[in-house]
Amino acid sequence: MLAKELILASSSDIRRNILEDNGISYIAKNHNFDEKILKSDKTLSPDNLSLQLARGKAMSLKDEFINHVILGCDQVCLLKDKIFSKPLTANKAVNNLSILSGQTHQLIGSYVFIKNGDVLYLSLIHI
């Protein structure tokens, strides 16, 4: 049986480093949430999209980690009204960077903590 550690619903090295740098004990587990449906819903605001993605990632692990606090995170990059998804290829990354270069854009970060399917805390940060 696992100790009741924080479960990080992510494989992100950056998110792992943040927890480690702050002395937080955790178990990292890839989420199994399909983001495509939410990302294709054009009625969601960028804030709501980011929050729902973070929540979905955490919720996808609730049955596997009963009585654990699970942290789901997401970040949305926004330039004017266009949302930039995480580039899956080097060419797409270069293209995105060339579009964003010199432009004022926003990063919207969402963090959702759940336990047994209940949201304990959520935060939305604009950078």
Placement of each model-derived feature along the sequence:
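N-terminal beta1-alpha1 ligand-phosphate binding loop
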Residues: L2-I24
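Anionic-ligand binding patches
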Residues: A3-L6, E20, D41-I125
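Cofactor-binding loop segments of dinucleotide-utilizing enzymes, especially the Rossmann-like FAD-
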Residues: S11, H31, N116
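Flexible, glycine-rich phosphate/dinucleotide-binding loops
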Residues: R15, E35, L120
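A short beta-strand-loop structural module common to alpha/beta enzyme folds
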Residues: I27-E35
